[in-house]
């Protein structure tokens, strides 16, 4: 691995030397990498939702790419369903290595531009850990909670100050790093009433100090520069949840707040439409909240009402068509309905219609190499359930479109048996038909191939109760 990266670095340096004389402005950068356990044979590079190029991996799963006429800023590379951001500035020669089984955790940058990008990825990972602490802190009273998160913000600012003193990064990096700290902090404030114990969220909001959300007056909800930044996008979602809640409590007669309330979700779409003017940001948020509602709802009439509101507000025709197809797929998976005919293949490449396998109460689960931790944890859980419920058939389907060899190897490497393991014959079509999102989605059927639960989760506290309901159906 080190030898591979040394060779990449030498190649990058040679390219720099060769081209510096022909590009006096130095308005270019190199991005290269090596991917262990690749999910495909290419990476996609983009900026601001515009694809720059699709780059093939070589025989050693490496690539090196020169970006001409570089516009300094955040670039995105996609590989096998995973996404990573990198900050590129003129004359950067940035190299990375990663393992798809632990995408973010394994990502390491080297070369010119590595310090700032390693700082940003480490900050992202630290924020993921810190988020769990913040959810615990949310049970504190508002003043104590404020002091805790203020302290965390101060630590981050001190760390950034030390980094700047040592490496003297650009003003662009400084802008991004400060925005990440600020918006992570603001998210901590916005999430408080939702995570704080108690169902009367309106009362919790009223109990907060008057200046608790004073920063909002300085927030730009249409910041095009930050539109692809994770902390900013997370903040927007938390803040819109909160602002919609404030509005909802003014006309709701129910003290017990329900996130699944159609009224609340319609309030939120209306708020997005009125507050956000940038079409890109607005359309993404409208899509996100509409899809999220549909995933958790089994009420067709309410789904239609929300979809109608969404279609009237979004200007993205591609997104609108996706939402319509998604809603139609969910409608076809109504509880009590017949499971659709789906072709699957086992690891001997034998094809089946999935309904031909359903003769007893059945649980259908899904996994992907992209979500490797979920793959392992779900199989451990399924092994437990198979022992406890021998009368239930468990069908486990890999949703990837990489052929049989890669998922088969993953199963064998982890000592998981191949019995009852399958792949979709037509992954793209089947994913859409079954509306598989998130990957934890589990479908429970009775022995008559009727859908009992279309959106269960083997990790939920009431899953075994749901399973017993399917078993005991007459």
Name each model-derived stretch:
Residues 13-16:
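C-terminal motif of bacterial Sec signal peptides marking the signal peptidase cleavage site
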Residues 352-382:
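Short active-site neighborhood of thiol/selenol oxidoreductases, capturing the structured segment around
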Residues 444-474:
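Thiol-/selenol-based redox modules, centered on thioredoxin-like
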Residues 319-355:
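N-terminal "domain-start" segment that seeds a small globular fold
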Residues 410-447:
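Short, internal strand/loop/helix patches
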Residues 373-414, 426-431:
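Structural microenvironment flanking redox-active thiols in thiol-disulfide oxidoreductases
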Residues 19-172, 188:
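A non-transmembrane, solvent-exposed segment enriched in polar/low-complexity residues
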Residues 223-296:
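Long, charge-rich alpha-helical interaction segments
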């Amino acid at each position: 691995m080190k030898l591979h990266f040394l060779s990449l670095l030498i190649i990058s340096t040679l390219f720099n030397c060769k081209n510096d004389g022909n590009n006096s402005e130095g308005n270019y950068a190199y991005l290269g990498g090596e991917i262990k356990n690749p999910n495909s044979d290419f990476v996609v590079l983009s900026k601001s939702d515009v694809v720059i190029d699709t780059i093939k991996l070589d025989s050693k799963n490496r690539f090196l790419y020169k970006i001409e006429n570089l516009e300094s800023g955040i670039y995105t590379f996609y590989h096998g369903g995973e996404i990573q951001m990198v900050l590129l500035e003129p004359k950067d020669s940035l190299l990375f290595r990663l393992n798809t089984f632990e995408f973010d955790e394994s990502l390491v940058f080297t070369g010119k531009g590595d310090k700032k990008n390693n700082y940003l990825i480490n900050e992202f990972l630290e924020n993921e850990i810190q988020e769990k602490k913040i959810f615990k802190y949310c049970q504190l009273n508002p003043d104590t909670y404020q002091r805790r998160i203020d302290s965390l913000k101060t630590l981050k600012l001190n760390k950034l100050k030390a980094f700047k003193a040592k490496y003297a990064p650009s003003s662009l990096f400084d802008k991004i790093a400060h925005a990440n700290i600020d918006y992570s902090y603001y998210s901590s404030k916005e999430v408080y009433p939702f995570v704080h114990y108690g169902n009367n969220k309106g009362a919790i909001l009223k109990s907060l100090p008057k200046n608790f959300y004073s920063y909002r007056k300085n927030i730009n909800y249409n910041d095009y520069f930050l539109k692809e930044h994770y902390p900013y996008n997370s903040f927007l979602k938390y803040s819109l949840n909160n602002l919609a809640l404030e509005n909802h409590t003014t006309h709701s007669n129910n003290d017990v707040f329900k996130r699944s309330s159609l009224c609340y979700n319609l309030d939120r779409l209306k708020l997005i439409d009125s507050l956000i003017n940038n079409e890109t940001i607005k359309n993404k948020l409208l899509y996100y909240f509409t899809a999220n509602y549909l995933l958790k709802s089994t009420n067709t009439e309410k789904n239609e009402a929300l979809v109608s509101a969404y279609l009237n507000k979004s200007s993205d025709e591609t997104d609108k068509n996706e939402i319509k197809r998604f809603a139609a797929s969910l409608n076809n998976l109504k509880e009590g309905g017949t499971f659709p005919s789906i072709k699957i293949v086992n690891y001997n490449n034998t094809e089946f219609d999935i309904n031909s396998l359903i003769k007893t109460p059945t649980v259908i689960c899904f996994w992907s190499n992209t979500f490797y931790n979920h793959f392992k944890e779900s199989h451990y859980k399924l092994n437990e359930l198979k022992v406890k419920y021998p009368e239930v058939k468990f069908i486990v389907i890999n949703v990837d479109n990489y052929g049989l060899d890669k998922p088969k190897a993953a199963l064998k490497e982890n000592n998981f048996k191949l019995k009852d393991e399958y792949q979709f014959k037509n992954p793209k079509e089947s994913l859409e038909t079954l509306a598989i999102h998130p990957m934890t989605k589990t479908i429970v059927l009775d022995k008559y191939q009727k859908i009992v639960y279309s959106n269960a989760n083997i990790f939920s506290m009431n899953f075994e109760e749901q399973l017993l309901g399917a078993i005991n159906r007459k």
